């Protein structure tokens, strides 16, 4: 019986190890330092319903910030809406659920045509993260690494593939924690903000259109009203780091 218990425990450990594998860290080369505490507001537009996205844009206009929006081929806003909001940093959200790389590249081209230029940063669903080797020929940077379910990193890092990885903080993890108008969530975020201030960290805040309407707005407004941070788009941060560190990597498929 004890041996059966051992086999069961060993099997569970193997499954957990497989689930917890952070494949992006396999390509870690070095941490990229920033010159000042920096914040990026990013959104996964998994629901291209324009009134919901307008709420996000209106709030950012109120505070004078531009964000980075990752667009999916399966659900994106109209060409008219994209043109009217051309100051937004539009990038590509890949869907590897049931799709191989050739289909993902095809969808990337659809989004590139929609926004009128080539997207250079990719983010993939947490449900199905690709090996970075699959996307390195088409992007200069990735932002799929999730700071809540993996080792929390306050700074981007360069991979040995040449791509930059931008770890993000998703609001979706707090759906079941949201109590008392989010005061419990804010306590956690305050600790993160203090750490980022002290270390010239990079905070990439991720919100989605649907929860934004209910409580995601409060989370983003909490971040945007914090002092001591330079707010940039992810593309701006990427270009700054590539210049600072003289990163010459150019994807073959761009």
Language model region names:
Residues 1-164, 184-205, 212-254:
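Catalytic alpha-helical scaffold of carbohydrate-active enzymes acting on polysaccharides/glycoconjugates
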Residues 165-180:
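Positively charged, amphipathic and often flexible ligand-engagement surfaces
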């Amino acid at each position: 019986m004890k041996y059966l218990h051992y086999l069961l425990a060993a099997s569970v450990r193997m499954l957990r190890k497989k689930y917890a594998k952070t494949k992006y860290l396999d390509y870690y080369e070095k941490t990229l330092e920033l010159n000042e505490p920096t914040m990026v507001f990013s959104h996964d537009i998994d629901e291209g319903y324009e009134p919901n996205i307008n709420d996000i844009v209106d709030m950012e206009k109120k505070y004078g910030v531009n964000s980075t929006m990752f667009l999916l081929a399966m659900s994106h806003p109209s060409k008219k809406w994209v043109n009217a909001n051309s100051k937004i940093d539009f990038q590509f959200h890949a869907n590897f659920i049931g799709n191989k790389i050739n289909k993902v590249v095809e969808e990337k081209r659809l989004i590139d045509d929609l926004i009128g230029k080539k997207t250079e940063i990719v983010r993939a669903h947490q449900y199905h993260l690709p090996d970075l080797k699959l996307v390195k020929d088409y992007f200069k940077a990735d932002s799929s690494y999730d700071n809540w379910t993996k080792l929390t990193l306050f700074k981007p890092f360069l991979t040995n593939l040449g791509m930059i990885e931008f770890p993000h903080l998703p609001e979706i993890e707090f759906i079941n924690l949201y109590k008392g108008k989010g005061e419990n969530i804010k306590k956690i975020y305050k600790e993160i903000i203090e750490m980022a201030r002290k270390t010239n960290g990079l905070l990439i805040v991720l919100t989605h259109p649907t929860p934004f309407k209910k409580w995601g707005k409060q989370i983003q407004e909490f971040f945007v009203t914090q002092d001591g941070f330079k707010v940039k788009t992810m593309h701006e941060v990427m270009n700054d780091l590539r210049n600072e560190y003289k990163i010459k990597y150019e994807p073959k498929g761009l």
